[in-house]
């Protein structure tokens, strides 16, 4: 396929994928796993990026939704809980008072507010050890001192 044809196909597919993402977001907000699966998997397969832009997930419980390869841009996830998976990307989002207790996640975050994060001894943001460890990264994010200390002790990259 030529580069031009590929570009045209991407332009044609983008609105379809965004409609699917809007329906996926609505299913998550409704805590409706069957609708989530019906809307997601024909359009976006496991291992492919699920991109949410300008969505409000305030107070949502993500417990039954595997979040690997989720991308949140300009989203509100304040007071959400059971966020887990790898990798999860956050850009310019509010993720205040999120409950990560018991979570195991690799997070790539930039320009986000993570103040008030809840965590416990089981919370993991780094897998493995040494040079081969998969580490979460918080770049230019707002963190309270306690959270910053917790993440640093785990070996999370904070800039």
What residues fall within each predicted segment?
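Generic alpha-helix initiation/capping and coil-helix boundary signal
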Residues: 13, 19-20
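Short, positively charged and aromatic/hydrophobic N-terminal segments
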Residues: 7, 12-14
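Tandem repeat scaffolds
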Residues: 22-25, 29-159
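Acidic, Ala/Val/Gly-enriched low-complexity intrinsically disordered segments
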Residues: 3-5
């Amino acid at each position: 396929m030529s580069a031009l044809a590929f570009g045209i196909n991407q332009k044609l597919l983008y609105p379809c994928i965004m409609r699917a993402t809007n329906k996926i977001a609505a299913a998550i907000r409704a805590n409706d796993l069957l609708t989530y699966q019906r809307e997601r998997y024909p359009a976006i397969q496991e291992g492919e990026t699920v991109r949410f832009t300008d969505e409000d997930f305030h107070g949502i419980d993500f417990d039954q939704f595997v979040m690997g390869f989720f991308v949140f841009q300009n989203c509100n996830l304040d007071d959400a809980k059971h966020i887990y998976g790898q990798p999860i990307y956050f850009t310019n989002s509010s993720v205040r008072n999120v409950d990560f207790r018991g979570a195991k996640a690799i997070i790539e975050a930039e320009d986000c507010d993570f103040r008030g994060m809840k965590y416990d001894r089981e919370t993991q943001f780094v897998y493995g050890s040494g040079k081969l460890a998969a580490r979460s990264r918080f770049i230019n994010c707002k963190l309270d001192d306690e959270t910053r200390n917790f993440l640093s002790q785990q070996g999370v990259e904070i800039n």
